[in-house]
Amino acid sequence: LQFLMTRGLRIPPHAKAHAETVVHTFERDVILYSLMPHAHLRGKAAKFTAAFPDGREETLLSVPRYDFNWQTVYVLNEPRPLPAGTQVKFEMVWDNSAQNPANPDPSRAVPWGDQTWDEMNAGWI
């Protein structure tokens, strides 16, 4: 299990599409079985991408309409071998605007926090 996160997260007030990316490089061969993105009420989209040592890139998971109320572990149909040197990039996008009906306060700069009114950029692989 590998946990990817941005602890210094700070989403500006009224930002409609604030994005942060976390990258992890595997030092040895691994087998990927599942992925799970996690954010709170302002989460808008999530994406995991593999950048292989030979330069190829592959989308592992794309969640274009993230919903806090539908948190799930996405299990791959087939386990995916990732060779040593592969980078997994986890990108989360948040909507801190008034157009987000779930947003409790668009005028607030939102930090990392465990409470639902704060935010997280957390991905498990």
Specify the residue positions occupied by each region the protein language model found:
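His-enriched metal-coordination microenvironments in redox/metal-binding proteins
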Residues: 1-125
